[in-house]
Structure formats: structure tokens, C-alpha cells
Amino acid sequence: MQGFRLVGGTALALQYGHRQSVDLDFFGTPAVPQEDIIDMLSSLGSIVVHNRTDKILQVVLRGIKVDVIDYSRYSWIDNPVMEEGLTLASPKDIAAMKINAVEGRGSRKDFIDIYMLLQHYTLGELLDFYQKKYPNYSFFRALLSLTYFDDAESQAMPKMFISQTWDEMKSYISNKVKGYNR
């Protein structure tokens, strides 16, 4: 979709291959009216529109949840990654968005993705990406949220393609945060 990037867990899983992800989140600046996006998605198969506002379109397309979000109020901090004809958000942008997501809801999948990002970047770099993307958001709150796993504990583990356990990932993230605070 022109003007959009695939973001979130699916985009990261396509780049790192660490877990299964079953939804599609497209963020960007719409180049066409929302009605044209619906028509384009309908051409791919049967869709059901679940939510539609000026900025958000949420549908189920052939059993797959697809979100199309007008993200024009935020800047991209890195160039997109092209993968098999798809325009993906870069790991740097995804890192910033994942920290923001953990700050808001703390899902298990988001923590798993942060664990994977920490295999490629330092915690300081992840936090720098977050601050660059969301300069008016609370750095301290973001840092605290990285060790608040309570909401994620009751959630199912996604199908994983790496050997680390949930407890190992939590411990790894916690140790990185403790080390950062020293």
C-alpha cells in the first residue's frame, strides 16, 4: 500500500525470524482516500470492517486482522526496509514503537520483540530511538515499563522460532535495565 509501512511484530518477525505473528499493521500517510484502501483490500478477498474512523481502519481480511493507521503525526526515524516487495518499518522505528506499546499495555509479544531488538542494539540505543520518535513522551516511564511484566504473565506464548524461554527473556531485559540504571 503506497505511503504505508508494515510495522509491529509481523514486520520484526519478517526481519528477525524469531516468532510467528498473525496480524498486519500498516502505518503511514495515506496517499488515497480510505474508501480506495477498502476497495483494494476487498480485491484480495472477503473483508469485514470492524472499526473505521478518520485515522484508523481495522478489518479482517480472509481471517487475518489488518489495521491501517494514519501515522502522519509522527516522523519515521529511519528508512524503510524492503523485503520481498513489502515496505517494512526499520528495526529502529519498530523499537521505538515497541517501547511505546509496552509503556501502554505490556503484552508478552511486545516484550519478546524487545528481547530480540536487544540482540541487535543496546538498551541505550533503543531508548534513543524512542526519544527521537516520541520526543514529548516520558523517558522515565518508558524505562520503568520495560520491567513491568505483570500484564503479560497471563498471556499465551506465541509460536517461537528461537529457544529462549519467557523467563529467560524477562531476566535478560531486567538485567539490561538494571545495568543501564547504574
Which role fits each region the language model picked out?
Residues 1-182:
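Compositionally biased terminal segments of proteins
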